[in-house]
A protein has these predicted regions:
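Helical "substrate-binding/catalytic lid" subdomain
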Residues: 57-174
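Rossmann-fold dinucleotide-binding core
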Residues: 1-65
Length: 174
């Protein structure tokens, strides 16, 4: 009676990408999508990625976020390894970048790693706590949605539990 179409379109990219018209959309159900809907998506996205049937766009968004949070956790761990052994953490990121392993988002995140803990206070700490909440929500959803390979749920749970430390946003209890 209402001629309703269902598909999913998840947006990837933050405020900076939105300002320059460089959003990426992850689409589920694109084959069933009316032309007018595809045209609308094309207005605000410079990259449209077909993920599969309805629901796949959301699954892809969560999967991309899992990869991002795993990289943030790895970057934090590697940074700490370098600093606690007296090494230069910038050398780590230079090597990672030169070998093609460092993406833009993780490179931007890495700038947080040199900020001393005592500066994570007030509004700044609240912003980091918000990021912790978002990351833990996404990682919990990934564990609920997927059936990871044997042993991988523990890996995801470890990343989930590490997020307060990754964002240097833990409370006094650490």
């Amino acid at each position: 009676e209402f001629n309703v179409h269902v598909f999913d379109v998840c947006v990837a990219g933050g405020a900076t990408q939105a300002q320059i018209g460089a959003q990426t959309v992850l689409v589920g159900g694109m084959d069933e999508m009316p032309v007018t809907a595809k045209e609308l998506i094309g207005i605000y996205a410079d990259e449209i990625i077909e993920a599969g049937p309805v629901g796949s766009g959301a699954a892809l968004k969560i999967a991309v976020n899992v990869m991002t949070y795993a990289q943030f956790a790895a970057a934090t761990t590697a940074h700490d390894l370098m600093t606690t052994t007296g090494g230069n953490p910038q050398a780590l990121f230079n090597a990672w970048k030169h070998m093609g392993q460092l993406g833009t988002l993780t490179e931007q995140f890495s700038l947080l790693l040199d900020i001393p803990s005592e500066h994570f206070v007030g509004d700044f700490k609240e912003k980091m706590m918000t990021q912790v909440g978002i990351s833990q929500k996404d990682l919990s959803l990934a564990m609920d949605l997927g059936w990871p390979r044997t042993g991988m749920v523990g890996f995801l749970q470890g990343i989930h539990d590490a997020m307060p430390n990754v964002y240097n946003a833990y409370g006094t209890e650490q």
